């Protein structure tokens, strides 16, 4: 099955291209960004060698849908989606922090808690919690935005301000937007029988100084979801929660001896496993959005994307 793991487009008035872990971003005339969601899969801050069919389309369509569903509370960078794998938006200067918000003790926070730590990113976590218990109120645990090949690192609000990574005035806006988006995401998830456990948001500034949401929102790559039905019973019985996230990929990697540490070999994914990951992503899409996933034509993905983007840029 065809996948798109790298692109090499040359659009009119193209100034530069930035290649992230999953997305490739083309700067058009220092005005627009054309963001292509590839089928690359990253875990533990490492890009895995194999692409996952339809993953880029799934992430792009979930993110753009949630941008539409939240634009009344938080402005965002998005202008158009000329292709299933592509979002076009305003050029922004990204803030160098990712705003992580957690409603439950899961993932990285749970691993820290299990080590006896009760503070994460300068935020105190209450005593007596079990993994996947709900926090009394959601906590914001920012990370520094790592360059490719580096690990994102936890950072406290006070350190962000002390190092002048973000001004206090801007940071208050980021915090408010983060809480508002998480609240809306929680409500939408509940309407689908899901719990939005934790998620991360990225923000940027437009040329005129407006703070906007950028990148992705409420996707399986940036968020963790649980099924709401049976959640409390599973907690009471100390059973694992049923998750909708890419945690299943992380688990598979850990079971196969890989956690992104130096010297560890990335395990090989056979075709059967790649297909199963693709199917899980489609399941995630349908559960999160509550609608059927329509597969795009992947016979020649690069050609399709190039044609659609060129058409959009010419008619703009």
UniProtKB/Swiss-Prot annotation:
SUPFAM superfamilies: SAICAR synthase-like. GO terms for biological process: 'de novo' IMP biosynthetic process. It is an enzyme of class 6 (ligase). Pfam families: SAICAR_synt. InterPro entries: SAICAR_synt/ADE2_N, SAICAR_synthetase_CS. Pathway: Purine metabolism; IMP biosynthesis via de novo pathway; 5-amino-1-(5-phospho-D-ribosyl)imidazole-4-carboxamide from 5-amino-1-(5-phospho-D-ribosyl)imidazole-4-carboxylate: step 1/2. CDD domains: SAICAR_synt_Sc. GO terms for molecular function: ATP binding; phosphoribosylaminoimidazolesuccinocarboxamide synthase activity. Keywords: ATP-binding, Ligase, Nucleotide-binding, Purine biosynthesis. Its EC number is 6.3.2.6. PROSITE patterns: SAICAR_SYNTHETASE_2 (PS01058). One of its GO terms (cellular component) is cytoplasm. It catalyses: 5-amino-1-(5-phospho-D-ribosyl)imidazole-4-carboxylate + L-aspartate + ATP = (2S)-2-[5-amino-1-(5-phospho-beta-D-ribosyl)imidazole-4-carboxamido]succinate + ADP + phosphate + 2 H(+). PANTHER family: PHOSPHORIBOSYLAMINOIMIDAZOLE-SUCCINOCARBOXAMIDE SYNTHASE. Belongs to the SAICAR synthetase family. HAMAP family: SAICAR_synth (MF_00137). This is Phosphoribosylaminoimidazole-succinocarboxamide synthase.
